[in-house]
């Protein structure tokens, strides 16, 4: 995979940063799991670096995963429904939308919402008798997948013998979690215990991504092979020749220079990659009043409307229908915006990109002075949710929602460098996606600011 960079006046800063990273032996220290690359305190760092060795670990599991996939097909399952949130679901969703349904394999569906209409949509699509559910939660305590499990357990028990219901469920979780205990008590077909030193958003190349991928018929061996090739190049001490370190340096330098809106543009065949990478970037760098804002899925507009707070990364799949995107990238580059172009030879290069970005983001985090492996705001959101639910339990109603003024009034206070975040707490549909895309286009063209979009409660994770 080739990488081209058009960085303009930032090229000197990036070169100096790469030289500094090399002087400080940052690449070597990351592989040595030296927490001081990020913080003096090793808390939530040294026990979160298992992704560095994930390809070695998971290559040993390929035969077992393929055997389990055959077991599932032989059992007559036609649908696989993954119940998860955030890091447990976004990687599988990218794989699902990128590779589609494979002949002779069950159809993979990912449910990472507790919106009643979305749940009904999935439930109406499947036959529970022929469905295997993957309950994916690192901690085993995540509210949404636990609620979804309880719902679908009751659905399955309504159509099969109670003693057979457990055979329709598989757990993917950390060793010793409450989900491991529950799976044993309630007769799950299988439990995949993931290495506990891999954080959720870094887990796509572990059981969390590979189990649903294998069951859906994806070539997980090819995916891991590409990931391992990237891993090897990310061990290169020379920061300039290390693709993960190089990308991370560009991200960090741009953010420190006010270009903190990393805008991912991708070929049509891999345009869902942004679902996964936006969580990786946002949750890893967005803390302590600093961070990089990932912008994925924005409609293409004329280059004149983009502000000077952008860094563009173009994920280009060779052989895809790239004419429109290529033309847009040429115009963006010609306008003086910084652009990084990453060439992919085939869709299984996603494995390499998963690892490249997992390496790049911690490098960027080190330049920003943040710990890329903790998630304080996610925990705050969970605590706030528990408080709201407690209020409902005690009073029978939720706290009143305060609505703001009009959108026009809101946008009048927007400043250069601001961005608009759109969160839709509703079922995903082509119609909604089209409407939101056009809305984003109008915001960019009228106000010249970046936009992000996601479905809730996925966006909270």
PLM features: residue spans?
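Extended, charge-enriched "interface" segments that sit outside catalytic cores
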Residues: 1-73, 319, 327-328, 336, ...
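Short, charged beta->alpha transition segments
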Residues: 67-68, 116-125, 248-251, 406-412
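Glycine-rich phosphate-binding loops that contact phosphosugars or nucleotide phosphates
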Residues: 70-237, 311, 315-320, 326-336, ...
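Catalytic nucleophile loop
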Residues: 83, 454-456
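Active-site phosphate/pyrophosphate-binding segments
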Residues: 158-313, 352, 356-450, 454, ...
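Phosphate-binding beta-loop-alpha motif at adenosine-nucleotide cofactor sites
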Residues: 268, 342-348
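Conserved catalytic block of serine-dependent lipid acyl chemistry
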Residues: 325, 460
